């Protein structure tokens, strides 16, 4: 426990590797935020099973995601980095919160409406419907003051705030009412082949996705083949030049240099030179992450030790909040012997 503001965030273990969009859009910013926050970062495997998962693959993806968190700079001795299912209080609090969530309230969640419309009623699980309630439990368990999320998750944080205020009003002050911390606008990375679409593991083609664990030569080929346009001018114009603008955003995020500076560097030069420069930046940034991830995966006992220690720390914090909620709602608590 520190005097720093409490922060909670997480990502699903939904692929063998996280991608560049995950890194720039979340991990890179988490790394910066952990220095000034009492941070809890979770691999949210309970959320992952709202769609069908192969059990062996889920375990492997969970381990690989945790390793990439660490390799990308999340320090498990500074932040609490754990696997969601290792802390049973997540599911316990989610049930309590579901009893004060209105059906219409849950049905209005945009992500549920979009995904259920694509999948159809028969293929849509109750778990997907109640996903935002579990997310609320994730946040409220740790008395999070701030929740760094993309703009597409803002609605879920608003629901979390509503549930916290509703519970507090009915049962007495129990939960901290969190604030959404919307991540930087420039942090959204788009598909290299379809730069109008966000980089996503569910893309039709893997050619537009740079994975953190891609070998350098694979990453180079993807960048050199990235969609641009025909005018040959390296300049940022999200509406008119989405492909080049996306590459400039990547260059800026990974190099720490302003887009305007990069534009000046490549003034009068073609896209070939620009892409070659970007390849160097990407390989320099992602190479150490790939190497460290592979080291961690080669020593599963050490990775398990880290995760177990952090889960114990997370569990202690979560149990305090859960006990307060149980007491407030009127559950008969077991007698300690």
Curated annotation (Swiss-Prot):
- Name it: Tryptophan--tRNA ligase
What are the GO BP annotations of this UniProt entry?
A: tryptophanyl-tRNA aminoacylation
Where on the tree of life does the source sit, at the highest rank?
Bacteria
UniProt motif 'HIGH' region: location = 13-22
One GO molecular-function annotation for this sequence? ATP binding
**A cellular-component GO term for this protein:** cytosol
Give one Pfam family, short name only: tRNA-synt_1b
- Name the PROSITE patterns on file: AA_TRNA_LIGASE_I (PS00178)
Query: Which residues of this UniProt protein bind ATP?
Result: 12-14, 21-22, 150-152, 189, 198-202
Which organism encodes this protein? Leifsonia xyli subsp. xyli (strain CTCB07)
**NCBIfam families attached here?**
trpS
Q: Does the keyword Nucleotide-binding apply?
A: yes
Q: Which reaction does it catalyse?
A: tRNA(Trp) + L-tryptophan + ATP = L-tryptophyl-tRNA(Trp) + AMP + diphosphate + H(+)
Q: Does the keyword NADP apply?
A: no
Compartments, as annotated in UniProt: Cytoplasm
EC code(s) of this entry: 6.1.1.2
Q: Which residues bind L-tryptophan?
A: 138
What is its biological role?
Answer: Catalyzes the attachment of tryptophan to tRNA(Trp).
Summarize the subunit comment. Answer: Homodimer.
Q: Which family does it belong to?
A: Belongs to the class-I aminoacyl-tRNA synthetase family.
- Motif segment ('KMSKS' region): 198-202
For this UniProt record, the keywords arranged alphabetically read as follows:
Aminoacyl-tRNA synthetase, ATP-binding, Cytoplasm, Ligase, Nucleotide-binding, Protein biosynthesis
């Amino acid at each position: 426990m520190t005097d720093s503001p409490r922060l909670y965030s997480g990502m699903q273990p939904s692929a063998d590797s996280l991608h560049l969009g995950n890194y720039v859009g979340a991990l890179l910013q988490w790394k910066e935020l952990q220095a000034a926050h009492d941070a809890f970062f979770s691999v949210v495997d309970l959320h992952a099973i709202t769609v069908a998962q192969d059990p062996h693959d889920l375990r492997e993806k969970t381990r690989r995601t945790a390793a990439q968190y660490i390799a990308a700079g999340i320090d498990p001795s500074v932040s609490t980095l754990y696997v969601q299912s290792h802390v049973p209080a997540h599911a316990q609090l989610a049930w309590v919160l579901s009893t004060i969530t209105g059906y219409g309230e849950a049905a209005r969640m945009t992500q549920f409406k979009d995904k259920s419309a694509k999948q159809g009623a028969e293929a849509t699980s109750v778990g997907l419907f109640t996903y935002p309630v579990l997310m609320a439990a994730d946040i409220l368990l740790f008395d999070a003051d701030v929740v760094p999320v993309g703009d597409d998750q803002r609605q879920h944080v608003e629901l979390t705030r509503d549930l916290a205020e509703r519970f507090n009003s009915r049962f007495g002050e129990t939960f901290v009412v969190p604030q959404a911390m919307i991540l930087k606008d420039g942090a959204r990375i788009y598909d290299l082949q379809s730069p109008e679409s966000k980089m996503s593991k569910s893309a039709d083609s893997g050619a537009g996705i740079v994975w953190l664990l891609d070998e350098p030569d694979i990453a180079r080929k993807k960048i050199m083949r990235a969609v641009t346009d025909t005018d040959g001018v390296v300049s940022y114009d999200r509406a008119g030049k989405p492909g080049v603008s996306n590459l400039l955003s990547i260059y800026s995020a990974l190099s720490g240099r302003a887009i305007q500076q990069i534009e000046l560097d490549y003034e009068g030069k073609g896209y070939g030179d620009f892409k070659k420069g970007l390849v160097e930046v990407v390989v320099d940034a992602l190479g150490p992450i790939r190497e460290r991830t592979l080291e961690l995966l080669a020593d599963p006992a050490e990775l398990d030790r880290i995760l177990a220690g952090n889960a114990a720390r997370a569990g202690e914090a979560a149990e305090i909040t859960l006990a307060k909620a149980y007491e407030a709602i009127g559950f008969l608590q077991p007698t300690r012997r």
